Amino acid sequence: MMLAYMDHAAAAAEPDAGAEPAVAAVDAAEFAAAMDFGGLVSARPAAVVRPASSDDVASAIRAAARTAHLTVAARGNGHSVAGQAMARGGLVLDMRALPRRMQLVVAPSGEKFADVPGGALWEEVLHWAVSKHGLAPASWTDYLRLTVGGTLSNGGVSGQSFRYGPQVSNVAQLEVVTGDGECHVCSRSADPDLFFAVLGGLGQFGVITRARIPLSPAPQTVRWTRVVYASFADYAADAEWLVTRPPHEAFDYVEGFAFVRSDDPVNGWPTVPIPDGAHFDASLLPANAGPVLYCLEVALYQRGGGGDGGGDDMDKRVGEMMRQLKYVRGLEFAAGVGYVDFLSRVNRVEDEARRNGSWAAPHPWLNLFISSRDIAAFDRAVLNGMLADGVDGPMLIYPMLKSKWDPATSVALPNGEIFYLVALLRFCRPYPGGGPPVDELVAQNNAIIDACRSNGYDYKIYFPSYHAQSDWSRHFGAKWSRFVDRKARYDPLAILAPGQNIFARTPSSVAAAAAVIV
């Protein structure tokens, strides 16, 4: 085994925990595990565990179970934004330490799958699948330097979600270590309750150590287009029309974002043109354009084998769909790019943020799912009101379909069939001379949430961070009872994912949660 428990953490275990391997102090690793991408929360663990296998993960959880207080959190690439993958005084599993062995699995039916470790980055899965096998998963996140286990524990959304479903709808099998230290292989047909509990389960029911992801032939090139709207009503109507087209009339990817009507390089129209260097002619904007504009972003894939009819056919299909949209004519931008390059497009944002220092600054991000019923009101009150000057980062806003999500998973969604992801991805300017203080930005996020609640919007927080079980009960709504039951079944000691602040490790923790079931 390759466990790296701190001496004092091992000593806290019961006497029979002496069967665990020798331990060593790892101050640097503990410091890293005490922080995350959000930069808003710090919680130092007692130890960092570097598992070499699922057995190591199970051993760490069993060691924690033999104590009265230790908790265990799985940490991927550290991109949580509110301490969700932290374990104050507990054990943090460095899931990136798992061997990066990936395997192509071919079922008797001919279906192909990638069998990958939970600590693998989606970027690693992409390059392995495309370069070695000419295959690819259907559903991605915009940013690929996230772990497989991390996104499957939350949802995993991007512009493909409306058509292919989120990542939690694109997994065939999981290997999971539950809170009792037992390793299970589960799927829709084998131990389905655990399978669906873990998907979107915020790490509460088990640690994903491996996942089996369906594959299909990888596209070769992508027709990537952006168009601009001055009217949110037109933008939303067109976006919703696109995501409800039948497959043979649909794009493969539909996203969009709001931006400020100015030449600000971070918040304004310079963020729109593709390829780099294309000109945004602001004189084409209508005279009645407001302070916030909208960019609809679509992509159509060209696959090999002649099934798409070649580039001319691709251009024809794109043209037919775009002609029906009500964007500002003349403000359209298009590029043909390779499939891997398209999926890796956010890497350039990371590279620039690292250069200017904002990558290391706090990231008070807010992600919401808001029903189509309320999205226009949200636009008026929040995007054109509270955020009319931008957020020093992307303001994503695009629709998805609830029917693409399996209700058996643990993910909490709005009630409406069409709902929007609203992602306010603030990149704080580095000090000195930065933007508003971080606590002001956090307060603004809270004010946005309060506005959603007080106005009665049909919404959910994506990547939620609550501190009271009454809030969690309201968040999960009708799913709360099932969530509590699953916790009692798979992690009765409340050992796992303490940073989510859903259940505390006390003898009565799960029982207390049952008392606030609504």
Curated annotation (Swiss-Prot):
Disruption phenotype: Increased cytokinin levels in flag leaves, reduced abscisic acid (ABA) levels, increased branch, tiller, and grain number, and delayed leaf senescence. InterPro entries: Cytok_DH_C_sf (IPR016170), Cytokinin_DH_FAD/cytokin-bd (IPR015345), FAD-bd_PCMH (IPR016166), FAD-bd_PCMH-like_sf (IPR036318), FAD-bd_PCMH_sub1 (IPR016167), FAD-bd_PCMH_sub2 (IPR016169), FAD-linked_Oxase-like_C (IPR016164), FAD-linked_Oxidoreductases_BP (IPR050432). Induction: Strongly induced by abscisic acid (ABA) and leaf senescence. GO terms for cellular component: cytosol. One of its GO terms (biological process) is cytokinin catabolic process. It holds the Pfam family FAD_binding_4. It comes from the Eukaryota. It catalyses: N(6)-dimethylallyladenine + A + H2O = 3-methyl-2-butenal + adenine + AH2. It is found in: Cytoplasm, Cytosol. Expressed in inflorescence meristems. Predominantly expressed in roots, leaves and panicles. Induced by abscisic acid (ABA) and leaf senescence. Catalyzes the oxidation of cytokinins, a family of N(6)-substituted adenine derivatives that are plant hormones, where the substituent is an isopentenyl group. Catalyzes the oxidation of various types of cytokinins in vitro with high efficiency toward trans-zeatin (tZ) and cis-zeatin (cZ), and lower efficiency toward isopentenyladenine (iP), cis-zeatin riboside (cZR), dihydrozeatin (DHZ), and isopentenyladenine riboside (iPR). Involved in the degradation of cytosolic cytokinins. Monomer. This is Cytokinin dehydrogenase 11.
